[in-house]
Regions:
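Short beta-strand-loop/turn "lid" adjacent to the catalytic site in phosphate-handling enzymes
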Residues: 78-94
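Conserved catalytic cysteine-centered active-site region
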Residues: 36-58, 91-122
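Fold-independent oxyanion-binding glycine-rich loops
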Residues: 13, 86, 110
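Conserved active-site "lid/cap" helical segment
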Residues: 1-83
Length: 122
C-alpha cells in the first residue's frame, strides 16, 4: 500500500462562470414563449450567464483550475490528481469533445505533467 495515499487531501477547488449576464426576459425573448409570461416571478430566476463563442466548458474549467491553484498557492508539479466535474464537454476551440478526458486537457494547459486525470459527468 502506498503510504502517501494516507495523507492525500483536497487543498482547493473552484468554479468559474462567464461574465456576460443575460436577463431572464432577454433569454425568454429568443424562445417561443408568450410575451406576457413573467418568468422571473414564476421561477425566481433573474438571469443566466452566457459564455462567448470561444469559451466553452473546457475554457471555463481551465479558468477555475487556475483560481484553485492560486487559492492553494500550489505549483503544477505539486498536483497529483485532476478531476473535472462537468455536465457538458464543450470547448470553444474543439466544439463537442469526447476523448481524451477534459481533465487531461486541463492538466496539459496548466503544465501539470505527473497527475492522474479523469472526468466525472452525468
Amino acid at each position: 500500500m502506498n503510504q502517501g495515499l494516507l495523507h492525500s487531501k483536497i487543498l482547493s477547488f473552484a468554479s468559474h462562470i462567464p461574465d456576460n449576464f443575460v436577463s431572464i426576459d432577454e433569454f425568454a425573448a429568443v424562445g417561443d414563449l408568450p410575451g406576457k409570461l413573467d418568468l422571473h416571478r414564476l421561477t425566481g430566476i433573474e438571469g443566466h450567464r452566457k459564455s462567448d463563442a470561444e469559451e466553452g466548458s473546457l475554457e471555463l474549467a481551465i479558468k477555475a483550475a487556475e483560481k484553485s491553484m492560486t487559492r492553494a498557492d500550489i505549483k503544477p508539479e505539486e498536483i497529483d490528481l485532476v478531476i473535472n466535474c462537468a455536465v457538458s464537454n464543450l470547448s470553444g476551440k474543439l466544439g463537442l469533445h469526447i476523448s481524451p478526458s477534459m481533465a487531461t486537457i486541463i492538466a496539459k494547459e496548466l503544465g501539470i505533467e505527473e497527475a492522474i486525470c479523469f472526468d466525472i459527468s452525468n
